[in-house]
Structures are given as structure tokens and as C-alpha cells.
Amino acid sequence: MSSADETQAELDAAISEGYARRDRDNMAPTIEYFTALLAQYPDHPQAIYEVGGAYDTAGDEQRARGFYERALAGGLQGDTRRRCLLQYGSTLRNLGLFDESITVLREARSDYPDSDSVRVFLALSLHAASRSDAAVAELLSLAADRIHSPDIDRYEPALRGNADYLRTLDASAQERAPQ
């Protein structure tokens, strides 16, 4: 095992330990834990992300935002990058930065097309931006893609057709909207 692999294994174990200790009702100890972990692994994008996630869970979105931006700029990869993009997009939405949130979540949707959670959070951001047609279209498409039952399968073409229609309405509204 290489030194980099050993370091990653140690970091992964430490992150798992932090999650095992986490109390969502009292995030201060978790923030302290992940901040200390970041001191051990300075500039490691995964450690940076975990500090951001702890602040986010505590409701301090503004502080979380900076950590998410640093983690992404530091080269976060794989599923951790997907989770970071999702949480960053959600944080931007909570901060009222709807267009930025949609941009980040569309990037995540493009890079991780099989992530249902990204699609749901994109729909939330579209809704928050008063783009309900696009939000419902995303959820209808998700239902058609992921819910397989005789009842849904029977109406899949209608769900997809309605999703396409709603996207058309949203696109028309976006073209008419003042820039």
C-alpha cells in the first residue's frame, strides 16, 4: 500500500469516527472534531468538505459555503464531490442565491446523471427560484425514470410528455424574463 493510500485510509477511518460520534442536535463537538482533523490534513479537499458539512448541518450555511468552495477548488473527486456539489447547491439556495444554486446543481446533474438526490435538490432550487414548471418537470422525469410499478409504467409516456411540456413553459418564461 502506498503512502497516499495509507493516508487516505487513515482519513476515511477518522471521518467514519466523526460521523459515528455526531449528534445532529449538538453539532459543536462534531465541528471541533472535523476542524481538528483538518489541522492534521491541511488542504486535503475531503477534510475541508467535512468541516463544511458539519457547519452546514449546524445551520451555519455561510461558513459552510466557504469550506465547500475550498474543497471543490482543491480537487474533490468521486462521490464525495457529488455530495459536496449537492450540499453546496442546497446551501446557496438556503442563502437565497437561487441562480447560483441551480448552476451548481445542474453541473452535478450533468456529472452525476444517476444521482436521484441531486435531481430532487435541483427541483427544490428551481422551485425556490419561482420556476415551479421546471421543478415539477424534474420530479416527473425522476418518477418516470425511477418508479417502476404497473401503474406508473402505464402512464410513463404521459409523465414524460407533461415533463417536456412544463420544460417548454419554463424555457418560454425564461426567455421573456428580464435579464
Regions picked out by a protein language model, each given a short descriptive name:
Residues 12, 46, 79-83, 117, ...:
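Start-of-helix register in tetratricopeptide repeats
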Residues 73, 127-150, 164:
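TPR/TPR-like (Sel1-like) alpha-helical repeat modules
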Residues 8-36, 40, 50-57:
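Alpha-helical segment of the N-proximal tetratricopeptide repeat
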Residues 46-110:
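Alpha-helical adaptor scaffolds
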